[in-house]
Regions:
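Phosphate/pyrophosphate-binding catalytic cores of soluble transferases and nucleic-acid-acting enzymes
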Residues: 1-338
Length: 338
């Protein structure tokens, strides 16, 4: 069975640099498993590999859709399979890199086949929640108690999706999720990078500061600018995906800055407002990293490497390479798929 290497871990842990060195060592290419790096123009806030890095090693499943488009895990699977197969035909082992647990689970465990988004229904549900906060979660508890127990009340998008599935299929999403499609027919070698939580949080804070310095605010301005024109708004509405519900605009960093840019607080305290926004991005990113840890820890077949205190890409790569050679003792580097 053809092999696939998966290098996973929480945001900011150190996957990107190490994965590029690993891809060079194995003479292969990288496939992104990041649900936000798929969007064009969202470079800084999603920490995409740099142009130089992508010239050194070819990356797939990055910059494939516009921010105004909707994208599902089902579509990801449909589009990633041909990429994987083409690499296998070339005698290469794909390296899948990312932190989107749902994408990785869909490949390795399978996915449930749910209905497509019903934007009119979502708008109606959103309106109900705006009228009475907490009403949707209570509704979900009635429709599907099991699903409600696994979703945080504040996670409005997941609450709405669970209700949507219940209403469209007449079945609870918790039941449908038990009827998974088959996993992709490959041998998956999962290597996870982890480090001390406090250390990771410090890295995240520093990275957010770097993103702001690199121009994240202007990047968000450029992204939302087209939607300030009535024609673009009308076209988006016609397509059935309200701007505030676009998946791309739910990305951490983008959502907070978009809110910051739309705020009417006087410019006298503009700098203070930006600092509050930056703090919010840091807090939300750390919470996301915590959720990623929780998600990945449920997977029993991940081979974890603790890289606490290790910051250099070369050192992280060497640890990953050692793990790979231990898992495949009869194979080395370029011949690992033999």
């Amino acid at each position: 069975m053809d092999k696939i290497i998966i290098l996973l871990g929480p945001t900011g842990v150190g996957k990107t640099g190490a994965s590029i060195l690993l891809a060079k060592a194995l003479d292969t290419e990288i496939i992104s498993a990041d649900s936000m790096q798929i969007y064009k123009g969202m470079d800084i806030g999603t920490a995409k590999p740099s142009v130089k890095q992508r010239e050194e090693v070819r990356h797939h499943m990055i910059d494939i859709v516009e921010p105004s488009e909707t994208y599902s895990v089902g579509r990801y699977i449909e589009e990633v399979v041909p990429v994987i197969d083409s690499l296998h035909k070339k005698g290469k082992i794909p390296i899948i890199v990312g932190g989107t647990g749902l994408y990785i689970k869909a490949m390795t465990r399978g996915i449930f086949s749910g209905p497509s988004a019903d934007w009119k229904l979502r708008e109606e549900l959103t309106a109900l929640e705006e009228e009475q906060e907490g009403s949707l979660y209570s509704y979900l508890q009635e429709l599907d108690p099991e699903a409600a127990s696994k979703i945080m009340p504040a996670d409005k998008r997941r609450v709405i999706r669970a209700i949507e599935v219940c209403l469209k299929t007449k079945q609870g999403i918790s039941e449908l999720q038990k009827k998974l499609t088959n996993p992709l027919p490959y041998e998956f070698i999962k290597i996870g990078l982890t480090r001390d939580r406090k250390e990771l949080y410090k890295i995240i804070e520093a990275r957010v500061d770097e993103m702001i310095k690199a121009g994240l605010v202007n990047e968000v301005k450029n992204l939302i600018h087209p939607f300030t024109h009535l024609s673009a708004v009308a076209e988006t509405a016609k397509a059935g995906s309200p701007i505030h519900q676009l998946s791309s605009m739910q990305a951490i960093g983008y959502k907070e800055i978009a809110m910051h840019l739309n705020d009417k607080i006087p410019l006298v305290i503009e700098s203070q407002r930006l600092e509050e926004t930056i703090s919010l991005i840091k807090r939300n990113t750390k919470r996301y990293a915590k959720r990623q840890f929780t998600w990945f820890k449920k997977e029993e077949d991940i081979h974890w490497i603790d890289i606490t205190g290790i910051y250099g890409n070369k050192e992280i790569f060497e640890r990953a390479e050692q793990m790979l050679n231990m898992l495949c003792p009869k194979n080395r580097h370029r011949t690992i798929n033999a």
